[in-house]
Amino acid sequence: MRALSSKLQISFAFLLAMVHVASHLPKLMAQFPEDHFDRLDASAVVELAGTQRLTLQGDIASELVSGVDRFLLKQLDASVKDRRLNWPEPKADGGTYEEAIKELRSDYARRIGLVDSRVEATDWIIESPLSRIADDRGSSALASDDTLRIQRVRWPVLEGWEASGLLVIPKTIRFGVVLVPDASQMPENLCGVGQGSSTDALVLARAGGLVVIPQVASRHREARLGRAVMTDQEYLYRSAFVLGRHLLGYHVHQNMSAIDLLKKTIPDRPVMVAGWGEGGWIALATGVCDTRIDLTCVSGHFGPREKVWDQPIHRNVHGLLKHFGDAQLAAMIAPRRLVIDPVPGPTVTIAGDGGAPGNLMGPDLSQAKFETDLAQGLLGKWKLTDKIVLSGPAEGALERSSGISDAGLSRSLASLSSDIESELKKVSGYRDPIPQVAWGPLAAVETRRVAWLKQLDRWQQRTLDLIQYERDAHWKNLDTSTPEKFAASVEPYRKEFRDEIIGHWDLPKKPLMPRTRLVYEREKWRGYEVVLDVFDDVISYGVLLVPKSAEPISKRPCVVFQHGLEGRPTDTIVKDHPAYHDVSAQLAEQGYVVFAPQNLYLFTDRFRTLQRKSNLLGKTLFSTIIAQHEQIVQWLASRPEVDPSRIAFYGLSYGGKSAMRIPALVPEYCLSICSADFNDWVWKNASTSAPYSYVWTMEYEIFEFDLGRKFNYAEMATLIAPRPFMVERGHADGVAPDERVGLEFAKVRRMYAARLGLPDRTTIEWFNGPHTIHGVGTFEFLSKHLRHQPK
């Protein structure tokens, strides 16, 4: 038994070691010198026939990344005007404003993950300070005075997940409130207790509000599984994003569940939602999604959103800025009322440490005023501009606070009812906290944070367990009965993958303008740097290897070999890099034309912010990478030495990710080989049980919104079919265990062999080795399907 235990410990240690090696492979890649080109005589520096001479100097890969950054920033700036011009206007044949924005509301709800049905709650679950046992005062109240009492409560939201927080009960109930804390606050802080507190909840209760204060995801940071340091918010966001859910959606869900109960408790009374800082962000989203809310108060949050990419990553809503800045969200609350309280929000700086870096600052009064003017402008033709009001002065600075300003509260209460505001003014000391001595034990505050986090994490993991069935249902319309029916029925899925998951730039591409420069002169091949134009500011760059046996010109098969994370084309050509073993050069020596492109995933946070910027527009890194590859295959197909019907794709690691996505959307690639990456991709992204998961690592950009409900790697391989597809897999590769790889590949095998009747077009090679090119089975696969005998 001891021997078995020892073996298990050794196996687990080996597993973690391999995960460690895999996670640090990018660092090994980055350490290799950039300049691996031959030192050629000046007279030999010539361009490839049919191209212009490349004169660009310096690090072209760095310029490529910088150019894409400029391109994305321009697209973000342009989105402001696009959103304004595309906003619904009254039609000559009538129609209400609510009808005009109905689809926009549904689209926003989907983007923030409101895709699950809430549990019907019958009543609040009341907890006492001592776990539902009445205290020595004979009351289950956490605290009380002569105007109100405070209960600790829970309420069901989704099957298996409950919200928790405080319920502040006034002596006379005139309205209901969901008051959302900032992420630095516990519900008790809004009752005047502790550092960074406010008495907003007490003010609202003394005005007659039945106040619900939900627990929200905290900014608490810690190393997760001893690895990447991140907030509770990011920890939940990572899994949620891939599953088609979102942290913002969870908060909106629990607010809407609270409103369900408020409407049962006080069915004939108005309801408002309010919050400061992070609470303002959540309140705004709740006001958009729940039309039962009579008034929304957004404090310390409202302003332009074109720099959400620099904020904490849980603020990342895929496709947000295609339709929704804060102005559009504000306009969607109309014809109900919105009060914007333009006080500064929290100032937050989150260091990376493996998690995503992010900053929160402001907004200042001028930003809030600017966005408010935009919102009112959207409502002008609908004659609804009076539904949005700014509670503060039009000019000047406002004091920093930890809650809603007096002006914001006063304006909100007056907007609900002038009687409510006047009743508050009758209460002496309505901002006064409840004396600390009146509070019961507060030790449960941290316990509640952890319990809330763990319960929601368990809910997500249960969703992950079941998501395969959602995917299967999503693919029910695929028809494999004949090749023609397969081709027709798979196309809508390809379009969905292109438009909704990857994102497609609907922009005209520039002429190729190929520029080349000879950089390698070897016995069997020559190598050329290549630059192609894609969009304004966007280029494609790589190295083309041309076998000398192709001279005089003969049509050859071409292999596009894609490097991995933090890699460069030269890593695949020279110096026997431990991951690549000069695979591009090996293939050129076998007589293939080889192109090694530079992909965008280089320079750590520089490229990761490209993903953040892309996501806001409903795009991803691969939106731009695919546009680059479309130009690459167009140029390769035009080359006299390349057979356009035999252009193959082969990639390792992040290049393996590319091998699953690019050929699925670029049909000019006649086959695809995924090396050192293939696995149960959704599980690898969303699991908080497996040490292999990206939840624990520095790759905060890796997550793709709503992928899990629609596509895993087997489904991506289906988009590649009926073209040949292969997996190259080392047993010691730490990206995933063999069992997970085999499980997902079995689905691919079934599709090709059983459903399409093409068993010879797919295979997997298992070899004893790590995260590396093996170059045995894959070379045979290329030779077979490219109809080429190595020279």
Can you name each region flagged by the protein language model?
Residues R174-T265, F302-H314, E551-S638, W683-T688, ...:
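Cap/lid segment of the alpha/beta-hydrolase catalytic domain
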Residues M1-F12, A22-H24:
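Bacterial N-terminal signal peptides that target proteins for export
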Residues R174-F175, A207-L210, R269-P270, T291-L295, ...:
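Loop/turn elements at helix/coil->beta-strand transitions in domains of secreted/extracellular proteins
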Residues Q215, S299-G300, D341, Q598, ...:
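Alpha/beta-hydrolase-fold catalytic nucleophile elbow
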Residues L158, G165-R174, G194, F535, ...:
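Short beta-strand-to-loop junctions in surface cap/lid or active-site-entrance loops
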Residues A258-M332, Q634-G708:
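Primarily recognizes the serine-hydrolase "nucleophile elbow" in alpha/beta-hydrolase
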Residues Q31-A163, L243-Y250, D260, T291-D294, ...:
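Alpha/beta-hydrolase-fold serine-hydrolase catalytic core, especially in secreted/extracellular enzymes
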